Amino acid sequence: MTEKPTLHPRNRHQGRYDFPSLIKAHPDLARFTITNPHGKPSIDFANPEAVRVFNRALLKAQYGIQHWDIPADYLCPPIPGRADYIHVAADLLADDNAGEVPKGAQVRALDIGVGANCIYPLLGHSDYRWRFLGSDIDPVALASAKAIVQANGLGKAIILRQQANRAHILSGLLQEGERFDLTLCNPPFHASRDEATRGSQRKWKNLGKQDPKRKLPVLNFGGQNNELWCEGGEIRFVSQLVGESVQYAERVLWFTSLVSKASNLPGIEAALKKAGAKAVRIIEMGQGQKQSRMVAWSFHDAAARLAWHAQRKSQA
């Protein structure tokens, strides 16, 4: 965890982590700090408790988030990568706004699958003061996210809502008249429980910690079933999201989703063509050894997108 040259220029996590500052912000991190083979301070990223405390320190030191915790066995997100998605999405909005990232409570974002960690709303509000609606099918995850929001006094900035129909993503979620500048989604990656387990085992092995007698750790490759896999995997989930987005075409400026598997792009592009998207963007992202990309689509042409921003400014 030394140099991270591929991070977005506005990402707060460039270069080495400042462990003295992190420990000052959250002293509990000191008991998890080790010296890596290069003689630099680090943590054991195979220790889920260490990762959770590290995230808590990072959020407090870098973002002013005073209280953050998640239940055991829920995804513990790598924050630099999550922040990159926020910044890349912000640039997407800036492209139609004379190069300026729109900030403030007039900008509304929808996080599909907000999770127990509530990470995208926390980062997006901290960096750009956007307001968020976070949705999830899991009531335990929503209860955790709600506790984080309330503990940090963010109830006016971050609203949480359960998607009551597990077969739907967007359908039936939005209320009459709700409009969003942006949607975010980090979809389930795997197509089955077995595939998800194999993926966790690969990451476990890559950390050099493979031990058949030891339970797989939870950290950022743990997670509940609905966080890790869905029937049909990433391609089916994103294609369904594209299909459901049509009914909200006029109420959302840009829909976006992360796509981990490049091999899924042709199928997603075909779904977007079928849906009649007027603008499509595929933006590569990379953090360390992990490559991903943001797929974005809009049902508004260039003139309509400019008008959207102008209308929002007039209401500010």
Swiss-Prot record:
Gene Ontology cellular-component annotations: cytoplasm
Enzyme Commission code(s) on record: 2.1.1.181
Gene Ontology terms describing biological process: rRNA base methylation
Record key words, sorted: Cytoplasm, Methyltransferase, rRNA processing, S-adenosyl-L-methionine, Transferase
Localization annotation: Cytoplasm
Enzyme class: transferase
Keyword Transcription regulation set for record: no
Domain of life: Bacteria
Keyword rRNA processing: yes
Summary of the function given for this chain in its UniProt record: Specifically methylates the adenine in position 1618 of 23S rRNA.
Name of the protein in its database record: Ribosomal RNA large subunit methyltransferase F
Native organism taxonomy: Bacteria, Pseudomonadati, Pseudomonadota, Gammaproteobacteria, Pseudomonadales
Gene name as annotated: rlmF
